Swiss-Prot record:
Pfam families tied to this protein: tRNA-synt_2, tRNA_anti-codon
Listed InterPro entries: Aa-tRNA-synt_II, aa-tRNA-synth_II, aa-tRNA-synth_II/BPL/LPL, Lys-tRNA-ligase_II, Lys-tRNA-ligase_II_bac/euk, Lys-tRNA-ligase_II_N, Lys-tRNA-synth_II_C, NA-bd_OB-fold
NCBIfam families hit by this protein: lysS_bact (TIGR00499), PRK00484.1 (NF001756)
EC category: ligase
Protein name per the record: Lysine--tRNA ligase
Gene3D superfamilies xrefs: Bira Bifunctional Protein, Domain 2, Nucleic acid-binding proteins
GO cellular component, as recorded: aminoacyl-tRNA synthetase multienzyme complex; cytoplasm; mitochondrion
Subunit and partners: Homodimer.
Function statement: Catalyzes the specific attachment of an amino acid to its cognate tRNA in a 2 step reaction: the amino acid (AA) is first activated by ATP to form AA-AMP and then transferred to the acceptor end of the tRNA.
Organism: Caenorhabditis elegans
Disruption phenotype: RNAi-mediated knockdown results in an arrest at an early larval stage. In adults, causes a 80 percent reduction in progeny size and a 50 percent increase in eIF2alpha phosphorylation.
Length: 572
């Protein structure tokens, strides 16, 4: 049996406790040399920043002018960033509380918040690259020509600032940088909206995307996904042996799609030109020339309406594949999109809110291949419960009258000119397209709706064409290309008649393209997909403006909308 432990006297207990306390104070004092705030010095009473946007703007301009007058450049040419904010977080996340590293690093970012604890300690949150870190500026470690208080008086929310110092983790567990050198890189002249409320006005967000990105950093996520879509597309097609090409944006004839073009004028040639509505005809001429697989990612321009799914300029990917038909292109499309969605989202099934975030209903969109197929003509007849004219007679006036009556009887609106093609398109949109949630191929379009598609090999009057829909919207269009130059010219002539009848979207005869076809286009499958609409689906946005960095906006009486935090860009 061991001897009983000697009991310490009360005095001895007090002595040991006092010694332990002193040791703890010594450790905390040592830690404070790099990490712990010094005791607050008497606060310096400073004038509050103006709340009026114009006065605030003037104050910031005066600060810049005063620095320039003193020979100080308020906009330095260079700051050497040694580590990104993302890498800073990755590298120093393992730090324990109150641990400080010896390594000196330099970071930079935009100030989103500023908090002062007396006159000797200032906290900042700096944002950049979609992330943020805390800066803990302590007067004890400050070096530089400008004194601590003056320097930090200059720095406001919105400024871009560089910091050089050591990484640490505070007592509260916040990963931070303790700077010894601070350089104001770019002053922000305007007051930023309060970070708690952010920027909610959608129209203002779209008009001032730069401010939207500053205050709503998650908006960038939409454009990261958009970029991934385009990168995946290019890599996929490159791996299949396609050649990426560039074709003219200004054309003498607006061909390749049924759409109303933008018109511009070339002064030297003294002629009108059209911004391209589609690159299709150029691509097929390249296939005639022997480039069997071509694709292009680029902007198209259509002088039509602006709404939740349409913008006058938009981005598409088009490809043309010799010795393939629309069945080959269907299989390629299924593989391309299903593998893309899996690569970007990590699953085939995604959720989509057609009425906007956090609303009902919620669609489950399933990109698992194979996709559903619906035959346009048979599907429409079934939905209408009607017998439709034989597809081979759709060019007749009798057929047009049947579809005109169907639209009237079913209250389906169709503005003039009420051609058979336009009437059919409205009926299909109302009764078929509106039901397609998961990816669905709509196949077998009539020839009168598809002037560039090849006739169906077994059903007269129809073509070998498909449109791909998801969440009720068209995202791709493809067909076996018409390569018969005689039939192509006849279809162009019919389109010209429709244009004379008032259809602004009908195509004109393109003699250069017709001549190219006469040299021989091999059997070819062609395909086009809208990048913007696919981006909307994969980012769960119901407004196309959310996936366009700078969407088209209607003017506001010739003046730009002002906000309660805006100020003129000139001194009052």
């Amino acid at each position: 049996m061991s001897e009983p432990e000697a009991k310490l006297s009360k005095n001895e207990q007090k002595r040991l406790a006092k010694q332990a306390k002193k040791e703890q104070e010594r450790l905390e004092k040592d830690a404070a040399k790099l990490n712990v705030a010094v005791a607050d010095a008497p606060k310096v009473v400073r004038e509050a920043d103006p709340s009026d946007p114009q006065e605030y703007f003037n104050m910031r301009v005066r600060m810049i002018e005063a620095r320039r007058a003193a020979g100080d450049n308020p906009f330095p040419h260079k700051f050497n960033v040694t580590i990104s904010l993302t890498d800073f977080i990755t590298k120093y996340t393992p730090l324990e509380k109150e641990q400080v590293v010896e390594e000196i690093v330099s970071v930079a970012g935009r100030i989103h918040s500023k908090r002062e604890s007396g006159s000797k300690l200032v906290f900042y949150d700096i944002h950049g690259e979609g992330t943020h870190i805390q800066i803990m500026a302590n007067a004890k470690f400050h070096t530089g020509d400008v004194d601590f208080v003056t320097l930090h008086d200059r720095i406001k929310r919105g400024d871009i600032v560089g910091f050089t110092g050591r990484a640490t983790r505070t007592k509260a567990g916040e990963l931070s940088l303790i700077p010894n050198e601070i350089l104001q890189l770019t002053p922000c002249l305007h007051m930023l909206p309060h970070s708690h409320f952010g920027l909610k006005d959608k129209e203002l967000r779209f008009r001032k995307r730069y401010l939207d990105l500053i205050l709503n950093p998650r908006v960038k996520d939409n454009f990261v996904i958009r970029s991934k879509i385009i990168t995946f597309l290019r890599r996929y097609l490159d791996n299949l042996g396609f050649l990426e090409v560039e074709t003219p944006i200004m054309n003498q004839i607006a061909g390749g799609a049924t759409a109303k073009p933008f018109i511009t004028h070339h002064n030297d040639l003294d002629m009108n030109l059209f911004l391209r509505v589609a690159p299709e005809l150029y691509h097929k001429m390249l296939v005639v020339g022997g480039i069997d697989r071509v694709y292009e990612v680029g902007r198209l321009f259509r002088n039509e309406g602006i709404d939740l799914t349409h913008n006058p300029e938009f981005t598409t990917c088009e490809f043309y594949m010799a010795y393939a038909d629309y069945e080959d292109v269907i299989q390629l499309t299924e593989d391309l999109l299903s593998s893309m969605v899996m690569s970007i989202k990590g699953t085939y099934k995604i959720e989509y809110h057609p009425n906007g975030p956090n609303t009902e209903p919620v669609y489950e969109v399933d990109f698992t291949p194979p996709f559903k197929r619906v035959h346009m003509y048979d599907g429409l007849a079934e939905k209408l419960g009607a017998t439709l004219p034989d597809p081979s007679t759709l060019h007749t006036e009798e057929a047009r009258e049947v579809f005109d009556k169907l639209c009237r009887d079913n209250n389906v609106d169709c503005s003039a000119p009420r051609t058979t093609a336009r009437l059919l398109d409205k009926l299909v949109g109302e009764y078929l397209e509106s039901t397609f949630i998961s990816p669905t191929f709509l196949i077998g379009h009539p020839q009168i709706m598809s002037p560039l598609a090849k006739w169906h090999r077994s059903i007269p009057g129809l073509t070998e064409r498909f449109e791909l829909f998801a969440v009720t919207r068209e995202i791709a269009n493809a067909y076996t290309e018409l390569n018969d130059p005689i039939t192509q010219r006849q279809r162009f002539e019919q389109q010209a008649k429709d244009k004379d009848a008032g259809d602004d979207e009908a195509q004109m005869i393109d003699e250069t393209f017709c001549n190219a076809l006469e040299y021989g286009l091999p059997p070819t499958g062609g395909w086009g997909m809208g990048i913007d609409r696919l981006s909307m689906i994969l980012t769960d946005n119901n407004n196309i403006k959310e996936v366009l960095l700078f969407p088209a906006m209607r003017p506001e009486d010739g003046t730009e909308k002002k906000t309660d935090f805006d100020a003129p860009t000139t001194l009052a």
